[in-house]
Swiss-Prot record:
Family annotation (Gene3D superfamilies): YVTN repeat-like/Quinoprotein amine dehydrogenase
Key words of the record: Chromatin regulator, Coiled coil, Nucleus, Repeat, Repressor, Transcription, Transcription regulation, WD repeat
Biased composition (Low complexity): 418-433
Name of protein: Protein HIRA
Species in which this protein is naturally found: Oryza sativa subsp. japonica
Skewed-composition ranges (Basic and acidic residues): 478-492
Matching PANTHER family: MEMBER OF THE HIR1 FAMILY OF WD-REPEAT PROTEINS, PROTEIN HIRA
Biased composition (Polar residues): 435-445, 499-510
Main location class: nucleus
Coiled-coil ranges (or none): 923-954
Record-linked InterPro entries: CAF1B_HIR1_beta-prop (IPR055410), HIR1-like (IPR031120), HIRA-like_C (IPR011494), WD40/YVTN_repeat-like_dom_sf (IPR015943), WD40_repeat_dom_sf (IPR036322), WD40_rpt (IPR001680)
Length: 975
């Protein structure tokens, strides 16, 4: 045996928490307290190494974690390296072509190899301390200090299951080499065996660790390569610490490895089995499978295969045992000054690497005469096959019906199609141009956008989230038919199609960007004047139904503040919106102008946009009759032009703060609290409307509705066609804060946006990025976006590629949350994720956004299916299925037209959503397949009943027979 302790294997003098040798035997990796992963060459520590090139020792340094690296584990194929850290993140690394880079300022040479992160797994809410790959490398298990074990699919990086059963920190996890179970060990002094078929708890073992003392960094248990033994850590049998061994099936401790003077931290089985003498494969078949320990009395003991295991302890020693002997084969003392925390065997089975908290690594190279002769892989596979059967291709679950398999196929195609569609949208965004010409130049010639279908009307003042308008999701669905044992048919959808990226781009090219959504720093030009902004819209004509509207407001501040009026301001307790931020100087404000553009798509393509401009002008005393001295007045000139042609103009004796307009009217809000409405030709449609305070936000829809928010926090919505006030409300309900509820002084609340949502209801966004939608039916504000779910897995994953309002609001929330303190590590992310999805589902329904509603619904159903939450899944399915019904016949057909249940939601058929989206998403977890089959049967019966009712409705009724008297008269006349 050769032992070595290379001094050059280090992590800047800090602890080394994990070590693992690549299955190919070319590299080994270490993770340490310096937040780095280092990949080393095995040639430099090989026992037959004669010429060591120091420049080739360290192959790469990975610096992508932001916390201590607790665990590194190679996949069995050696391509991927998984790492877990204190930053609660798991990363999957892969080698890429070329050489690596060096850390700036470190003075280190560039890496020899180039390793990059190919997948980041987020979901844990505390430190990730142990990892283990499945036998086929398709799944990764992770144990964390959040008391859970997460199961990750390597096909897509999604967490497929969260195992909750431990009441304390999970510090070790290991995978059954057969693939049927997972074992985890926790500080609650229990070991839990989990089934991989449905991720249920198979057995909880306790009692063997109840007398254990102290605490350890890890409890890294291990499964034997034969699949029969689990060696655990941190056991105690007076007067020694032990490593209890559990036997498969009964899951009870049959014997212990005794001898350490401190708690056992890590155990590691050799990858293969050994025998004392060389033998042929025929001897291996005849011999028992070698599950017995040293007390075995088998007659063929000399040829019986046995396991080799290494144990590391807090007593700074390492012991190596075989299951063919009751005494340790090897004891390593005085190699480390602190606890041993991780072990790794080489692929050939004759080298052992160990790392310690003292920041050092030791290597032990054994001879065949010491450990025995290693079984070939084919022999080991034959041993497992004789005991467990053929484990190749063994499925984790068993489908109970052909429908389950067909729905799983539909779900897989659905997920793949959605993923490809998202990637295409991300890689090929639609081209959108924003026209912001310099005010010193003339308005450029611009082509009017092409006429869009009537169902795709947009306002020219639409925000940036309108650019990527989601295309229609529905498409022809291929179906598969089969017959059940009772002879009835069942229709199974194959997949749900998604539109191509080309369609989305074509529909998005003609949509403009609302200049009011641009950053305030972009609004003022370099010379201090306000540039003109053009927003392309879809003004069809001057009728009542098809309009386009845009808005503008002056750049007084970056945001507006709502706060309670001071005591000196009056006792009415009214709200006031005050200007905050950088106020434009008077000289600058006096020369700045505000302008908007409106296009008319009814005109030819070369027509120029209509421009409305409000420009401050000053009149001196010499220009006014009857006034002397240096007195001057400030006015605002309103000019409407098309190119160089002036359509109309007017003057207002006040400073203009906001502008809005469409093909029907123009609206001008002033600082003195008046609102002037003009017709499209420039006539004053009505006397000036006095609001009592300056207008700070204004917006209009495609028809005749106008929204206005004043500085005092009052909101008005008028229908200018009928000259009625549709809504008059205050933003007072948005001001209430926790400090006010506690009786403290109320802080201010900044409003950054107030406009019409796409559904036509007013939408207000605060500086905290909380968004509120006014529900005219409930007559109250609905909070549709907030930061109440920081631990949700979907807190920042809703993208705006679908062009939805809710997606954009969610992204703003995510950016705002990034600046806030992190949440508690003990937060239950599962509960928050479910609550967040339910909130998003209700918010998309309130916004009347069918695309986002369907997206949230799919995510919610997949989450419930992953958690096997049958009660909520049943409730959702029942709401989409309709009212309960028994055997459908003509007498009960009236139930299908029950007015209390709407068969549609946001223009989508509920039964179609149930058949094409909900049921295929439920098929991802076979644990709920019985519930799935139940609703498939019910849906088939409902659709059959609906078909019968429709056929009855279209059956023509026979004409009534002629009256008897008329018939007799005709007969007499004929005679």
């Amino acid at each position: 045996m050769i032992t070595e302790k290379p001094s050059w294997i280090r992590h800047e003098g800090l602890q080394i928490f994990s070590i693992d040798i690549q299955p190919g035997g070319i590299r080994f990796a270490t993770g340490g307290g310096d937040q780095k992963i280092r990949i080393w060459s095995m040639k430099s520590v090989a026992k037959d190494n004669d010429s060591d090139d120091s420049s080739q020792r360290l192959l790469a340094t990975i610096r992508d974690h932001f916390g201590t690296v607790n665990c590194v584990r190679w996949a069995h194929h050696g391509r991927y390296l998984a790492s877990g850290s204190d930053d609660q993140v798991i990363q999957i690394h892969e080698r890429k072509a070329g050489t690596g880079t060096s850390e700036f300022g470190s003075g280190e040479p560039p890496d020899v190899e180039n390793w990059k992160v190919v997948m980041t797994l987020r979901g844990h809410t505390a430190d990730v301390v142990d990892l283990n790959w499945s036998p086929d490398d398709s799944t990764l298990a992770s144990g964390s200090l959040d008391n859970t074990v997460h199961i990750w699919s390597m096909a897509n990086g999604i967490c497929t299951a969260v195992l909750r059963g431990h009441s304390s920190l999970v510090k070790g996890v290991t995978w059954d080499p057969i693939g049927s179970f997972i074992a985890s060990q926790s500080d609650d002094k229990t070991v839990i065996i989990w089934r991989t078929s449905d991720w249920s708890l198979a057995h909880r073992t306790e009692g063997h660790w109840s007398k254990s003392l102290g605490s350890t960094f890890f409890r890294r248990l291990a499964w034997s390569p034969c699949g029969h033994f689990i060696t655990t850590t941190h056991g105690f049998q007076k007067p020694r610490h032990s490593a209890p061994v559990l036997e498969r099936g009964e899951w009870s401790a049959t014997f212990d490895f005794l001898g350490h003077n401190a708690p056992v931290v890590v155990v590691k089985f050799n990858h293969s089995m050994f025998r004392k003498h060389l033998s042929s494969g025929q001897d291996a078949k005849a011999a028992p499978a070698g599950w017995a320990n040293g007390a075995s009395k088998a007659s063929s003991k000399e040829h019986q295969p046995y396991n080799v295991i290494a144990i590391g302890s807090q007593d700074r020693t390492i012991t190596v045992w075989t299951t063919a002997s009751a005494r340790p084969l090897f004891v390593a003392k005085h190699f480390f000054t602190q606890s041993v925390v991780d072990l790794s065997w080489s692929p050939d089975g004759y080298s052992l690497f160990a790392c310690s908290l003292d920041g050092s690594v030791a290597t032990f190279h054994f001879e065949a005469k010491e450990l025995g002769y290693r079984l070939r892989d084919a022999e080991l596979d034959e041993l497992k096959k004789n005991r467990y059967g053929d484990v190749r291709g063994r499925q984790s679950n068993i489908a109970e019906s052909p429908a389950q398999l067909l729905l799983e196929e539909a779900s897989a195609k659905q997920s793949a199609s959605k993923k490809v569609s998202s990637v295409q949208q991300f890689q090929s965004p639609p081209k959108v141009s924003t026209d912001a010409p310099n005010p010193s130049t003339s308005v450029p010639n611009q082509k009017a956008p092409e006429a869009l279908p009537e169902d795709e009307k947009k306002t020219a003042g639409s925000t940036a989230d309108d650019i990527n308008k989601a295309p229609r999701l529905s498409s022809p669905v291929k179906q598969r038919e089969y017959r059940r044992p009772d002879g009835r048919k069942r229709i199974i959808p194959e997949a749900v199609g998604f539109p191509s990226n080309q369609d989305m781009s074509n529909r998005s090219q003609n949509q403009g960007v609302d200049f009011s959504s641009l950053d305030q720093r972009m609004i003022l030009g370099e010379n201090g004047t306000r540039p003109s902004y053009s927003a392309s819209g879809n003004c069809n004509n001057c009728g009542v139904r098809e309009r386009s509207g845009i808005t503008a407001r002056t750049n007084i501040s970056e945001s507006l503040v709502i706060q309670k009026a001071s005591a000196g301001a009056g006792s009415d307790g009214r709200l006031s919106i005050e200007q905050s931020g950088s106020v434009v100087p008077g000289s600058l404000a006096s020369c700045s102008s505000l302008s908007i553009h409106v296009f008319n798509k009814k005109d030819n393509e070369d027509s120029l946009p209509v421009r409305l401009e409000a420009k401050p002008v000053e009149r001196s005393a010499g220009d006014m009759i009857g006034l002397g001295g240096a007195f001057s007045t400030k006015e605002t000139e309103i000019t409407c032009t098309r190119g160089t042609e002036t359509l109309w103009s007017d003057r207002i004796s006040a400073k203009v703060t906001v502008l809005a307009g469409n093909a029907n009217f123009w609206a001008v809000g002033c600082e003195d609290g008046c609102l002037q409405v003009y017709t499209k030709c420039g006539r004053r449609a009505m006397p000036a409307m006095m609001m009592g305070s300056a207008a700070v936000f204004i917006d209009c829809d495609e028809c005749w509705k106008l929204l206005l928010v004043t500085r005092r926090g009052l909101m008005y919505i008028w229908d200018l066609y009928t000259r009625t006030c549709v809504l008059h409300d205050s933003l007072a309900s948005l001001v209430t804060s926790p400090d006010e509820a506690a009786g403290k002084d109320t802080g201010t609340v900044k409003v950054i946006s107030a406009k019409f949502s796409r559904c036509g209801s007013p939408l207000v966004v605060l500086a905290s990025r909380h968004a509120f939608l006014y529900d005219t039916s409930l007559k109250c504000w609905l909070r549709i976006a907030d930061d109440c779910f920081p631990a949700s897995n979907f807190a920042s994953s809703f993208s705006s590629t679908q062009g939805g309002e809710l997606g954009k609001l969610q992204i703003d929330i995510g950016k705002f949350m990034a600046r806030k303190p992190i949440w508690s590590r003990v937060t239950d992310d599962g509960v928050q994720t479910r609550s967040h999805l339910e909130t998003q589902l209700a918010a998309s329904l309130a916004l009347k956004s069918p695309q986002e509603y369907r997206q949230c619904l799919l995510s919610y159903i997949r989450f419930l299916a992953r958690e096997a939450d049958e009660s909520r899944l049943r409730e959702v399915c029942e709401s989409f299925l309709g009212p309960p019904m028994g055997m459908v016949d003509a007498a009960s057909s009236a139930d299908l037209k029950n007015p209390s249940w709407d068969p549609d939601v946001l223009g989508m058929k509920k039964h179609k959503l149930l058949r094409e989206d909900i049921l295929p998403s439920m098929a991802t977890n076979r644990k709920v397949q019985r519930l799935l089959n139940e609703f498939m049967d019910l849906l088939s019966e409902y659709e059959a009943a609906e078909t019968n009712v429709e056929q009855m409705d279209v059956t023509p009724t026979p004409p009534p027979p002629p009256p008897a008297a008329a018939t007799e008269g005709n007969n007499n006349g004929a005679s």
